[in-house]
UniProtKB/Swiss-Prot annotation:
GO terms for biological process: deoxyribonucleoside triphosphate catabolic process; nucleoside triphosphate catabolic process; nucleotide metabolic process. ITP binds at residues 11-16, 51, 67-68, 84, 143-146, 164, 169-170. CDD domains: HAM1 (cd00515). Binds 1 divalent metal cation per subunit; can use either Mg(2+) or Mn(2+). Its EC number is 3.6.1.66. Transmembrane segments: none annotated. Belongs to the HAM1 NTPase family. Disulfide bonds: none annotated. GO terms for molecular function: dITP diphosphatase activity; ITP diphosphatase activity; metal ion binding; nucleoside triphosphate diphosphatase activity; nucleotide binding; XTP diphosphatase activity. This is Inosine triphosphate pyrophosphatase. InterPro entries: ITPase, ITPase-like_fam, RdgB/HAM1.
Length: 187
């Protein structure tokens, strides 16, 4: 058994924090800090790395950051890493309307965690992907785009927390991080 490691997860999203703690809780102790880190424009990987670098500089130590993308196949991957801004501007119905003139409503959810050991260090990425389709909102509306992303017949919002934490893009990324931690890579 590895000694308990503490990770400082940079987030102000209590739902993300709860999922991370539920999935990593037996391997690592999660502290959380809400700091504003300006996000660059770029690929999900570029955004995740830069966010981790900037957070490590601000904190002065090791950090874990997370970025999520939701890409619509019909729109060649848009809104992608900018889903948060699209959702804020358009809402669930607006995101659905973007696809109304297309037959293809398939989407890919991508979660990228970036771990940075500290200022000046290169972040390490852990990424998970889940395929699904975009549907009219179903289930509770309190966690981002969960009500419109359907995987295996249920939206993320319709799934109980345990089920979502077994199939989600976030779970898949965290499983890779968890394995890395269990392998003793983090001193």
């Amino acid at each position: 058994m590895i000694p308990t490691v503490k990770l400082n997860f940079i987030t102000s999203n209590k739902n993300k924090l709860a999922e991370v703690k539920a999935i990593l809780g037996n391997v690592v102790e999660i502290d959380s800090q809400a700091i504003e880190v300006p996000e660059i424009q770029g690929s999900i990987e570029e955004i995740a790395k830069e966010k981790a670098r900037r957070a490590a500089e601000e904190i002065g130590g090791p950090v874990l950051t997370e970025d999520t993308a939701l890409g619509f196949r019909a729109l060649k991957g848009l809104p992608g890493a900018y889903i948060k801004h699209f959702l804020s501007a358009l809402g669930h119905d607006g995101l659905n309307k973007m696809l109304d003139s297309f037959e293809d409503r398939s989407a890919e959810a991508v979660c990228t965690f970036a771990f940075c050991r500290g200022p000046g260090e290169e972040p390490i990425l852990f990424q998970g992907r889940t395929e699904g389709i975009i549907v009219r909102p179903r289930g509770p509306l309190n966690f981002g785009w969960d009500p419109i992303f359907e995987h295996n017949g249920m939206t993320y919002a319709e799934m109980d927390k345990e089920e979502k934490n077994r199939v989600s893009h976030r779970y898949k990324a965290l499983a890779k991080l968890k394995q890395w931690l269990e392998d003793g890579t983090l001193p």
